[in-house]
UniProtKB/Swiss-Prot annotation:
The lineage of its organism: Eukaryota, Metazoa, Chordata, Craniata, Vertebrata. It is found in: Nucleus; Cytoplasm. The keyword Transport applies. SUPFAM superfamilies: ARM repeat. The modification N-acetylmethionine is found at M1. It comes from Mus musculus (Mouse). The modification N6-acetyllysine is found at K635. Its main location: nucleus. This is Exportin-T. Gene3D superfamilies: Leucine-rich Repeat Variant. Found in a complex with XPOT, Ran and tRNA. Probably found in a complex with nucleoporins. Interacts with Ran and tRNA in a GTP-dependent manner.
Length: 963
């Protein structure tokens, strides 16, 4: 072997040596006999370096995995012998191999097993066991090999490459069950028995193996007195009990007859209870309690599955026994649910949830069951509470886990509300009222959870459209009382961000309360508009409040009229466009400011003011933005530093975004025109459009202005049209693929909306736009530049979408009036799009365009020469495209393209009649060497009045035609 290259295997080697080692590995993988050198090195213990040994196993692994079938029988025998002699040598080694080497060896054994067990090596396990006997090192390797085999055969995390490998794995398992599983199980029993006092590591490994295999072997081999008693014995040994717990969990989880499962679980529980495992509070080892909690959860859920099956089968007596068995586990479940360790509590939630599901199905609940429901409710309320360690300013992994845990508890609360809505409402009301009575002297986490529970009731007790304050009188009045307490108690002043946020979340969730008791709106508005909300010291609170305030105002727009000017005055400072200089930190981020602008726009538009007042208020809102925009644009034109340019461009873009966001409140009932605001937005357009001619930061500025234009086309309608030509001219200068791709939807929007009104403009800019597109598409790019290829593909799609919009909007004369040469160029590109590019989305669009053009121009009075074009180009395209190898009829998008291809052929037949059939019969299809009877069949299908019949036929036609 190349000793120099092997030096690079050491993790501390320099990069040149490491590169050489990698290259050597690739070389050995390709070489037909290099593996033999590695096999020999392993068998003869040539190398003592661990990394070299690992390397040798890697080479062998590659050989077995990818090239085994190429080896001769003698070579395959050599690999078997090498591995067995290596295994034999491990018995005598003074020191065991490193774990990573043992694991890699086990993987190679497992790969060889999967390859050879059914054919050449049926005695695989007997050979291994005869080598390892009861030698602890041998047993360790035997167990690792078993785990590696389980991974290959059944591990859910391993993606098996094909259906064939899945079937082969099933066959291997079936054969193992018949031939060797009882012997393997016996070997596990012997290992567990012989090593129980001497080698805890081997015992843990063995328990892991039993847990893994129990899912697919005959359960009676494990679930018997001999085995279970031994496992229960291990539960009392500190170093073994976690693995024993997991092993029992796998046994309990195994599917089996419901009555047998019930008996198994009950016998386990009896022994565990007698041994004192149910006394959770005595146990200090939290890792073990977490595993035990998972086991109890498994036992509980197994009993519930048994109960469900028995009820379904009508076995009433057995079902009753199962229910009693479940009930006896509830006290233990509750102990685990309220455990201070959230992992332990989380592990039992599944059982708890399913238990409540049973109670929901029972016609009446016993007193004990009602008490259980109440106990679960108390547990949920307790466990929802934050602990002292929760870091609100810098939330890390622990905090994220608690948030997830809270989501699980929320599901429990929702399920509780399905079982007993009255209890849930009464419990929350009790806790809420008691806490808010003394909120000033109560710890933040208790105040937060009290408000949080009120918030959660909205989903736990669902109603349509948030109508919590009508309908059921007792529920409505309870919620009304709590909301009244929330907004009048002063708790919004609590000095903790979690309480503040929960307050605002809750008032917004129950916004309908303020339509019932509108007298509370001013005090809530004040909370939003002072140091408790938008001026809070915490950026997190300010940010969330900006969004919630917007929702609050919009949902109560009918109640807002008396407060509009006061609100607009108070938010004035928050509307300022943050100057991108001097490291100035504004109160809100630009994203948060979007919500404030949206709120301001909504207040003005939805107000009961006359149009002139609305116009004046909107002008006051947007004029400072326009003035600031002009100043910043001038600064950008003069800025030298690129970072400064980028920051100014961002600010300009924000200004455009803010103006755009104010227009969100307009609707069909409240149009810009009706509100008298057209001129303000036209002024904005005039202010923003000069940014398009700025040579700096083009991408950012164009993107912002383009988005604003999209919005104004909707809001201002034809009033926007005078601005479009010059805007388009600027946007077509110095274009990249992405610019064009984003510009075309703007033109599509104008075309689809205004149709004939924009015909002169479209005719004028049609060829300049096409030239810009073609110029970008024809630019050379590196063969392997995937992003450039993707950009071109997207631009091509946009181009065809544009042509589709033009033809689909009844504006085909825009194309027809471009002169014969240009028209032909456009038509050729559509044919190319339909045939030459393997992009089914573009192909579908091209066939839609072709159908439309045939419909418009394909009759007797169509443009001169178009009928020839139909027969020379469009008809062939309908055959050449689907015949291409890249046209995959198993792909959904491609099938849609074929469907449009069928429509095109049907349209040609509709417009040209018998002439089209004659052309297909006598000229075109014979030129493709189609058999006469198939030609006849094709033409008959084409002439069917039902288009669907032809679409289905066409798919079959091409499936037959393709090799």
């Amino acid at each position: 072997m190349d000793e120099q290259a092997l030096l690079g295997l050491n993790p501390n080697a320099d990069s040149d040596f490491r590169q050489r080692a990698l290259a050597y590995f690739e070389q050995l993988k390709i070489s037909p006999d290099a593996w033999q050198v590695c096999a020999e090195a392993l068998a003869q213990k040539t190398y003592s370096d661990d990394h070299v040994k690992f390397f040798c196993f890697q080479v062998l692994e590659h050989q077995v995995k990818y090239k085994y079938s190429e080896l001769s029988t003698a070579q395959q025998q050599l690999i078997r012998e090498t591995l067995l002699s290596w295994l034999q040598a491990q018995m005598q080694n003074p020191q065991p191999e490193k774990t990573f080497i043992r694991n890699k060896a086990a993987q190679v054994f497992a790969l060889l097993f999967v390859t050879e067990y059914l054919t050449k090596w049926p005695k695989f396990f007997f050979d291994i066991l005869s080598v390892v006997d009861l030698n602890p090192r041998g047993v360790d390797l035997y167990l690792r090999i078993l785990m590696a085999i389980d991974s290959e055969l059944v591990d859910r995390d391993v993606v098996h490459t094909s259906e064939a490998s899945g079937l082969e794995n099933t066959l291997i398992k079936d054969t193992m069950r018949e031939q060797c599983i009882p012997n393997l199980v016996e070997s596990w029993y012997q290992i567990l028995h012989n090593y129980q006092y001497t080698n805890s590591e081997v015992l843990c490994q063995c328990l892991e193996v039993v847990g893994a295999y129990v899912s697919w072997i005959d359960l009676s081999l494990i679930a018997n007195d001999r085995f279970i008693n031994m496992l229960l014995g291990h539960m009392s040994v500190e170093v073994l009990r976690e693995e024993a717990c997991d092993c029992l969990f796998e046994i309990v989880n195994k599917g089996m007859d419901p009555v047998d499962k019930m008996k198994l679980v009950e016998s386990l529980c009896q022994v565990l209870q007698t041994a004192g495992f149910f006394s959770i509070d005595q146990e200090e080892d939290l890792d073990f309690v977490a595993r035990f909690s998972k086991l109890v959860n498994g036992m509980g859920q197994s009993l519930i599955v048994s109960w469900t099956k028995l009820i379904k089968n009508g076995a009433v007596k057995n079902a009753q026994e199962a229910l009693e068995a479940i009930e006896t586990k509830v006290p233990l479940m509750l102990q685990l649910l309220v455990h201070e360790d959230d992992d332990i509590s989380s592990n039992i939630i599944g059982f708890c949830y399913d238990y409540l599901h049973i109670l929901k199905q029972l016609p009446v609940l016993s007193d004990q069951q009602k008490a259980n429901v109440e106990a679960i409710m108390l547990a949920v309320m307790k466990k929802l509470t934050y602990d002292e360690e929760y870091n609100f300013e810098n939330e890390g992994e622990d905090e994220a886990m608690f948030v997830e845990y809270r989501k699980q508890l929320k599901l429990l609360l929702d399920r509780l509300a399905q079982v007993s809505p009255e209890l849930v409402l009464a419990s929350v009301r009790r806790v809420f009222s008691a806490t808010l009575q003394n909120w000033q002297t109560t710890r933040f986490m208790e105040v937060e959870v009290a408000v949080r529970l009120l918030y959660m009731l909205a989903e736990a007790l669902p109603v349509s459209h948030g109508a919590h304050f009508s309908g059921d009188v007792s529920k409505a009045s309870a919620l009304q009382d709590m909301m009244r307490t929330l907004v009048t108690s002063g708790v919004s002043s609590y000095q903790h961000t979690s309480v503040t946020l929960e307050f605002f979340e809750t008032v917004v969730r129950y916004e309908k309360f303020f339509t019932v008791e509108p007298q509370h709106i001013p005090c809530v508005l004040m909370a939003f508009l002072d140091h408790r909300g938008l001026w809070h010291s915490s950026a997190k609170v300010r940010s969330r409040t900006a969004y919630l305030f917007s929702r609050f105002v919009k949902s109560l727009n009918k109640q807002m009229n008396p407060y509009i000017e006061e609100i607009l005055n108070r938010i004035q400072d928050l509307l300022a466009l943050s100057p991108p200089e001097n490291g100035y930190q504004s109160l809100l981020s630009s994203d948060d400011q979007l919500f404030i602008y949206e709120t301001a726009g909504a207040l003005i538009v939805n107000s009961e003011y006359p149009a002139e007042n609305k116009q004046a208020l909107m002008k006051d809102l947007l004029t400072p933005l326009m003035e600031r925009f002009k100043v910043l644009l001038e600064k950008l034109m003069m800025a030298q530093d690129e970072e400064r340019q980028a920051s100014l461009a961002d600010s300009l873009n924000h200004a455009v975004g803010f103006a755009s966001r104010t227009s969100k409140a307009f609707s069909n009932k409240q149009t810009v025109k009706q509100c008298g605001c057209s001129q303000v937005y036209l002024d904005c357009l005039q202010t923003f459009l000069p940014a398009l001619s700025c040579p700096l930061q083009k991408d950012v500025l164009r993107s912002g202005v383009r988005t604003f234009l999209h919005r104004m086309i909707i809001c201002l309608e034809e009033e926007v049209l005078p601005f479009i030509p010059s805007a388009s001219e600027h946007m077509l200068k110095d274009c990249e693929a992405k610019d064009l791709q984003e510009f075309i939807p703007l033109i599509n929007q104008i075309t689809a909306k205004f149709k004939m009104q924009v015909s002169p403009f479209l005719q004028q800019m049609f060829m300049p736009l096409l030239h810009a597109i073609f110029e970008v598409l024809l630019r050379p790019a590196e063969d392997n530049d995937q992003s450039a290829a993707l950009e071109k593909q997207m631009l091509r799609r946009s181009y065809f979408a544009f042509l589709q919009t033009v033809t689909g909007s009844g504006m085909s004369e825009v194309i027809a009036n471009q002169g014969a040469e240009n028209v032909e160029q456009v038509l050729v590109t559509i044919i190319q799009g339909a045939v030459d590019y393997p992009d089914p989305i573009a192909q579908k669009t091209c066939f839609i365009i072709l159908s439309k053009l045939v419909e418009l121009w394909g009759g007797k009075d169509g443009p001169v020469g178009f009928a020839d074009f139909v027969y020379k180009h469009i008809v062939p395209a309908c055959f050449l495209a689907p015949l291409k190898q890249t046209f995959d009829l198993a792909d959904a998008q491609t099938v849609l393209a074929l469907s449009e291809c069928a429509v095109t052929l049907k349209t040609i037949h509709l417009k040209r009649g018998p002439e089209c059939v004659q052309y297909l019969q006598q000229e075109y299809l014979p030129s493709l060497q189609v058999a006469p009877e198939i030609i006849q069949e094709f033409c008959q299908a084409l002439q069917q009045p039902d288009a669907k019949v032809f679409k289905n036929y066409l798919k079959v036609f091409f499936q037959r035609a393709k090799p």
